[in-house]
């Protein structure tokens, strides 16, 4: 097994991983940085993000407003000190991206343009047409090429991390092009591996988003936090799950049922706004969890449209006009034509909620470090405490760069002070990784990884979807336990050493099953409804701050069982209150302003 010596290893070369690598290179120009990715960096899932990235940019906006929107949007399960750090650093990172070449869309006067996004009181979403993720990733990738100390290991699949006496010491990866193993020694490792959306049947995620980093951390005793909170995006294309960005609604698109009725006004997000005049926190610009839940209610009422690919509602953009659509949403027009045969200029787009984002992830502190010294996690694979029970759109792209930078700087500092590990113990671990791989390749049985993966996706959709019941969640838990047993009998039929996808998909499935069990058990144990976790059983349909204003921590014990613990939520300045949107939110804002004025007048 070849060995490469580095100071810092970063797993994942999407937005978070690239930003961490750049920050590390800037913090210590002499540091050797290994950047490992199972795909070429520009194929990372960040490239699929369309809508935008949040940062205060206008005089009538403020850090306080962004903080409030994020905490309320997360249904008060956010770590408020983390949110405060985040909102204050977003503008700096957006400006830095521009200095590196990110082509933010502009107003006629040359100032940066910002669009409305759901759950936000004021428009603060920076965007580059409707390919924001692509432009951010391209900017970060080309910037990273300026630093020769960043050595890329493209198309390398990380099999496991190496840990000695509570401190990370490196990792073992497979060179997918050759089928050989490489040991990368480093005294700090940053996980930037993305979410776990592929454990669901229909999702907006790329094929690489399989929960690998979460699974590796879990196997070393690091808990996954708040895994019951999985966001459904309200507007995915039926069948494919391809995303129709929230920017569509930010520009003025509307959602209608089979009767042409704008149904969101019936679910606490009204009154109805004028056509083509979107209003922050109203109607289509409500938070994603509530907009997705409204679809479910319309489906139950029989107000959705039946199609061969499932029930849908319509996203109508026609009133925006051809010029605006081709200027602001050109990619959306292309996608709608290619995947559902619809020209948004002339017809409404069929959409339905689709699994989109993992709010939970690898538990970290406010500096992105886990319980294992030197092991950091950032981006969607992590739970730093930013999103709580429901993420606001455009906060995630900003999270990649704000916390990517922080993780890179902190990991560089940790690596410089780590000392040396037990060489014999580390080598023994690496040999163990190699042996487990051989055992998997030679495993005998009649099971097929693809069939197990499909059954997992269906089970997660049925039991851990938009609305949940104890019966369906238990059915999912039982099914996952069955699939875990069947996974032990998966047979790998491809014997090649070069790009053996049969082997790689099997390894991904193993991580996915472990992560899915954390999601299902965490959901069953949270006997309340909060954010993206909504229950229908009696006594659990409302938020319960007395018993469940706390984080769920899911551990995987040595015998394969999922064990749950809980930790407190950090509340600093904004105590829990009712989440309100639409006219109710305006009334609450007016009452708060009047109260402040009265106090000021003494």
From Swiss-Prot:
Residues 581-602 are annotated as: Disordered. The modification Tele-8alpha-FAD histidine is found at residue 45. It catalyses: a quinone + succinate = fumarate + a quinol; a menaquinone + succinate = a menaquinol + fumarate. FAD binds at residues 12-16, 36-38, 44-52, 156-158, 192-193, 212, 356-357, 380, 391-397. Changing residue 240 to M: Increased cross-linking to SdhE, FrdA is flavinylated. Binds 1 FAD covalently per subunit. Flavinylated by SdhE, about 5% flavinylation occurs in the absence of SdhE. InterPro entries: FAD-dep_OxRdtase_2_FAD-bd (IPR003953), FAD/NAD-bd_sf (IPR036188), FRD_SDH_FAD_BS (IPR003952), Fum_R/Succ_DH_flav-like_C_sf (IPR037099), Fum_Rdtase/Succ_DH_flav-like_C (IPR015939), Fum_red_fp (IPR005884), SdhA/FrdA/AprA (IPR030664), Succ_DH/fumarate_Rdtase_cat_sf (IPR027477). Its EC number is 1.3.5.1. It is found in: Cell inner membrane. It is an enzyme of class 1 (oxidoreductase). Gene3D superfamilies: FAD/NAD(P)-binding domain (3.50.50.60), Fumarate reductase/succinate dehydrogenase flavoprotein-like, C-terminal domain (1.20.58.100), succinate dehydrogenase protein domain (4.10.80.40), Succinate dehydrogenase/fumarate reductase flavoprotein, catalytic domain (3.90.700.10). Its cofactor is FAD. Inhibited by oxaloacetate, a substrate analog. One of its GO terms (molecular function) is succinate dehydrogenase (quinone) activity. GO terms for biological process: anaerobic electron transport chain; anaerobic respiration; bacterial-type flagellum assembly; DNA damage response; fermentation. Belongs to the FAD-dependent oxidoreductase 2 family. FRD/SDH subfamily. Part of an enzyme complex containing four subunits: a flavoprotein (FrdA), an iron-sulfur protein (FrdB), and two hydrophobic anchor proteins (FrdC and FrdD). Can be cross-linked to SdhE. Purified from membrane fractions associated with protoporphyrinogen IX dehydrogenase (hemG). NCBIfam families: fum_red_Fp (TIGR01176), PRK09231.1 (NF006686), sdhA_frdA_Gneg (TIGR01812). This is Fumarate reductase flavoprotein subunit. The lineage of its organism: Bacteria, Pseudomonadati, Pseudomonadota, Gammaproteobacteria, Enterobacterales.
């Amino acid at each position: 097994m070849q060995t490469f010596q580095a100071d810092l290893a970063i797993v994942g070369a999407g937005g978070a991983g690239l930003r961490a690598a750049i920050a590390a290179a800037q913090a210590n120009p002499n540091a050797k940085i290994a950047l490992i990715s199972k795909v070429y960096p520009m194929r990372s899932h960040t490239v699929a993000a369309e809508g935008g990235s949040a940062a205060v940019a206008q005089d009538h906006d403020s850090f306080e407003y962004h903080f409030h929107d994020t905490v309320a949007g997360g249904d008060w399960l956010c770590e408020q000190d983390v949110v405060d750090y985040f909102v204050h650093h977003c503008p700096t990172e957006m400006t830095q991206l521009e200095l590196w070449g990110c082509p933010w869309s502009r107003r006629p006067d040359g100032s940066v343009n910002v669009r409305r996004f759901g759950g936000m009181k004021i428009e603060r979403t920076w965007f580059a047409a409707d390919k924001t993720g692509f432009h951010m990733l391209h900017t970060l990738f080309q910037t990273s090429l300026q630093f020769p100390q960043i050595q890329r290991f493209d198309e390398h699949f990380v099999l496991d991390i190496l840990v000695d006496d509570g401190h990370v010491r490196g990792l073992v990866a497979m060179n997918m092009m050759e089928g050989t193993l490489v040991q990368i020694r480093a005294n700090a490792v940053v996980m930037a591996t993305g979410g776990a959306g592929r454990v669901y049947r229909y999702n907006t995620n790329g094929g690489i988003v399989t929960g690998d980093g979460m699974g590796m951390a879990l196997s070393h005793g690091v808990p996954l936090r708040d895994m019951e909170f999985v966001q459904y995006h309200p507007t995915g294309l039926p069948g494919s799950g391809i995303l129709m960005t929230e920017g569509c609604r930010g520009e003025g698109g509307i959602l209608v049922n089979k009767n042409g009725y704008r149904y969101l006004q019936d679910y606490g997000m009204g009154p109805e706004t004028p056509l083509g005049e979107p209003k922050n926190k109203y109607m289509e610009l409500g938070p994603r969890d509530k907009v997705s839940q409204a679809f479910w209610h319309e489906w139950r009422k029989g107000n959705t449209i039946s199609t061969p690919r499932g029930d849908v509602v319509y996203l109508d953009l026609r009133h925006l006009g051809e010029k605006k659509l081709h200027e602001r949403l050109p990619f959306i027009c292309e996608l709608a034509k290619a995947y559902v045969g619809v020209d948004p200029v002339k017809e409404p787009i069929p959409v339905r909620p689709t699994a989109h984002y993992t709010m939970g992830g690898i538990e970290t502190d406010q500096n992105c470090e886990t319980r294992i010294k030197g092991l950091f996690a950032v981006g969607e694979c992590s739970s730093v405490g930013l999103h709580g029970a429901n993420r606001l759109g455009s906060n995630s792209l900003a999270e990649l760069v704000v916390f990517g930078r922080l993780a890179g700087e902190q990991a560089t500092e940790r690596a410089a002070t780590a000392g040396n590990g037990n060489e014999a113990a580390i080598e023994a671990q690496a040999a163990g990784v190699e042996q487990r791989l051989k055992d998997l390749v030679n495993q005998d049985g009649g099971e097929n990884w693809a069939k197990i993966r499909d059954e997992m996706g269906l089970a997660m959709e049925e039991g851990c979807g938009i609305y949940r019941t104890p019966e369906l969640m238990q059915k999912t838990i039982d099914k996952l336990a069955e699939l875990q047993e069947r996974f032990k009998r998966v047979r790998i039929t491809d014997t090649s050493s070069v790009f053996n996808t049969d082997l790689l998909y099997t390894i991904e499935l193993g991580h996915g099953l472990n992560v899915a069990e954390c999601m299902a058990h965490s959901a069953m144990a949270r006997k309340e409804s909060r954010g993206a976790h909504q229950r229908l059983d009696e006594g659990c349909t409302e938020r319960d701050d007395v018993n469940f204003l706390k984080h769920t921590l899911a551990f995987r014990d040595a015998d394969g069982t999922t064990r749950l613990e809980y930790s407190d939520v950090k509340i600093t300045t904004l105590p829990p209150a009712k989440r309100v949107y639409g006219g109710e939110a305006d009334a609450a804002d007016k009452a708060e302003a009047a109260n402040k004025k009265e106090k000021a007048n003494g």
